[in-house]
Amino acid sequence: MIISASTDYRAAAQRKLPPFLFHYIDGGAYAEYTLRRNVEDLSAIALRQRVLKNMSELSLETRLFDETLAMPVALAPVGLTGMYARRGEVQAARAAAAKGVPFTLSTVSVCPIEEVAPAIDRPMWFQLYVLKDRGFMRNALERAKAAGVTTLVFTVDMPVPGARYRDAHSGMSGPYAAPRRILQAMTHPAWAWDVGLLGKPHDLGNISTYRGNPTGLEDYIGWLGANFDPSISWKDLEWIREFWNGPMVIKGILDPEDAKDAVKFGADGIVVSNHGGRQLDGVLSSARALPAIADAVKGELAILADSGIRTGLDVVRMIALGADSVLLGRAFVYALAAAGEAGVRNLLELIEKEMRVAMVLTGAKSIGEISADSLVRELGA
């Protein structure tokens, strides 16, 4: 299959993966309205073309949390990344490091912190949930510190699991899920050999290390689901703010008032996110939520955004709407599933090329020059 655009990787991943894995990363909550709007709302934003601006000197480099990024992009935390390629978190982290952008390891990764951190030559980020088992949280934070993690990304929009109906149809969950997954793996021999057999162990590395015994998909659905904490409040995060002496980012902000609360709390950054449309269906797309949040807190902390970003044009749109940087989730997992580390590297190169074209043709010579003026004000807006 020919890969000529960043969006080509989705079809390539679908061909290679067992359905339960493809639909797990591809799907969203309930009827998936928000999942679709994330992409549609962002792609509908018109860029303002400018010409004859002498764009011979152009830089995508930016600074974020005292790090220099080759472009305003980081790889988002995605659970079970190690099921999409052999030791997938390690491969994705290497690709990100090679392209000069951060990789964020998920709490529910296949590869543990201690396996991923030594594999790259730049500090990585780590994502954590608020769970009822505070012992696990403290253990994960201590291990992240010991591994040299610089930035903590704290996900706050999962006090309860989202209802992902597609998972029951695909075999990730629902009746006879385990035998259905086995049958699907048998019909995808390339994945079964490379990931299913050679990619073992398939347990949740960070959780297994804490519990002292192997964990798997049933634990992902069971133990983790039982440990989400609906009683979470800002007060529950105070001990973490005191414990963690590096940058702390609150992920899952969609309302300006919550963004203001993050400033009061002392967060170093927020991620404007609806969890890729995987939690509450019917909420605002990130693209629609971002401008009001930027108006409320821009300059008081770093603003990152995710959900719906598939191309370099989308990155430029999000920056113009008020983000300082973005997180790529599904996009990099599709590339990882299709072609491993090389696929993620190529995706990031395509994103960079698409950004360069967009910046040249909107007259922005640096990331700092991308602004609301880079967008067309639609009639009636």
Swiss-Prot record:
Q: Does the keyword Flavoprotein apply?
A: yes
Q: Which UniProt keywords apply?
A: Cell inner membrane, Cell membrane, Flavoprotein, FMN, Membrane, Oxidoreductase
Task: Please name the Pfam families in this protein's record.
Answer: FMN_dh
A cellular component term, taken from the record's GO annotations? plasma membrane
Location of the active site = 275 (proton acceptor)
What residue ranges carry the coiled-coil annotation? none
Q: Where does substrate bind?
A: 24, 129, 164, 278
Q: Which cofactor does it need?
A: FMN
- What SUPFAM superfamilies does the annotation carry? FMN-linked oxidoreductases
Q: Where in the cell is it found?
A: Cell inner membrane
One Gene Ontology molecular-function label: FMN binding
Q: Does the keyword Transmembrane helix apply?
A: no
The record's EC number reads 1.1.-.-
Residue ranges annotated for the FMN hydroxy acid dehydrogenase domain, each copy included: 1-380
Q: Which reaction does it catalyse?
A: (S)-lactate + A = pyruvate + AH2
- Top-rank taxon: Bacteria
Q: Which GO terms of type biological process are on file?
A: aerobic respiration; lactate metabolic process
Topological relation to the membrane, as annotated: Peripheral membrane protein
Note the InterPro entries from the entry.
Aldolase_TIM, Alpha-hydoxy_acid_DH_FMN, FMN-dep_DH, FMN_HAD, FMN_hydac_DH_AS, LldD
Q: Which residues bind FMN?
A: 106, 127, 155, 251, 306-330
Which family does the record claim for this protein?
Belongs to the FMN-dependent alpha-hydroxy acid dehydrogenase family.
Subunit and interaction comment: Homotetramer.
Question: What does this protein's UniProt record list under function?
Answer: Catalyzes the conversion of L-lactate to pyruvate. Is coupled to the respiratory chain.
Q: What is this protein called?
A: L-lactate dehydrogenase
**UniProt organism field:** Pseudomonas paraeruginosa (strain DSM 24068 / PA7) (Pseudomonas aeruginosa (strain PA7))
Q: Which gene encodes it?
A: lldD
